[in-house]
Amino acid sequence: SGGKDSAVLLDLVKKALPKESFVVIFGDTGMEFPDTYDVVKHMKKECEEDGTPFYVARSHFDPAESWNLFGPPARVLRWCCSVHKSTPQTMKMREITGKNNYVGLDFVGVRAHESVARSKYDYENYGKKQKGQYSFNPILEWTSAEVWLYIFSKKLKVNEAYKKGNSRAGCL
């Protein structure tokens, strides 16, 4: 996402796995902070330099068109992430693998402290979001302080959106 959790997750995955065994997919909702696009550009450059495949997944819907169709995103109807992030990422994986029914492992940078719903997540699951997809949430129990300590200790790029008072760097 270009946020702090994704930055940590990407660093951990790059250290744990051979670069030819995974790809990075940025789900571009079209509603990101300009600072987030700067961070993603930096991450893409780093991936290109170390040979890690980097892709961008976008919805075929224009964000304004989606708002007109579905109304503004809300806690009750959270269409935004599925329409502009999750589904385009799934479509991109199908394109990359050349298979509609691929089996893959998705590393997700979610944390239990972010919401009540996320506090109920498991470290791993199979097929909850996408058939054939294993999901692994390695930083699930990390606190925000632990994420920031990791970022500063590893000298990872910080999204300027945080320095401007935003508590998150995902879509607007």
Give the residues covered by each predicted segment.
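Class I SAM-dependent methyltransferase core
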Residues: 1
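Nucleotide-activated chemistry modules centered on ATP-dependent adenylation/adenylyltransferase
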Residues: 4-172
